[in-house]
Amino acid sequence: MKKFFFYFCLFLFCFIQNSWSDDFIINNIVINKPWIKSIHSGQKVTSGYLEIINNSKSDDVLLSIESNFAKNNQIHSMNIQNDVMKMKHLKSGLLIKVNSKIGLKPGGFHLMFSDINEELKNKKFLYKKLNFKKNGSIEIPFQIKKKYTKDHVNHKH
């Protein structure tokens, strides 16, 4: 009986662990794995990332993002032109075509938060509200992650 109970608890634990999801759904929009880069003391800018899947029957637009921890919350594009990184605020929002997905990730589209007014130390999540043109708004938790690239770690001054 003890053996059965042990395996039952082990199964239940594994099931519960795997059932936790980083997916959030609003109408026909799925948002996967939202996260933001952690910041150092005194830093006033950070960025956020996620994947958006549009399962609706028409295009939609991520119009804006809202959060209390930063005064400025913007959607940005980023690309390299003539070996120079260029970021652009997408004032009209980010188009998500019908039946497609778009990744907001380092080196590409991303969310930019500046004039940060809240200490992020000891926090694991921050809530942000995403506003879509057709599918409405949803407030979701963004996991705070330390993210360092190999290039950054080996950078020498």
Predicted regions and their residues:
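Positively charged n-region of N-terminal signal peptides that target proteins for export
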Residues: 1-4
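Bacterial N-terminal signal peptides
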Residues: 7-15
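Compact, glycine-rich, soluble single-domain proteins
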Residues: 22-157
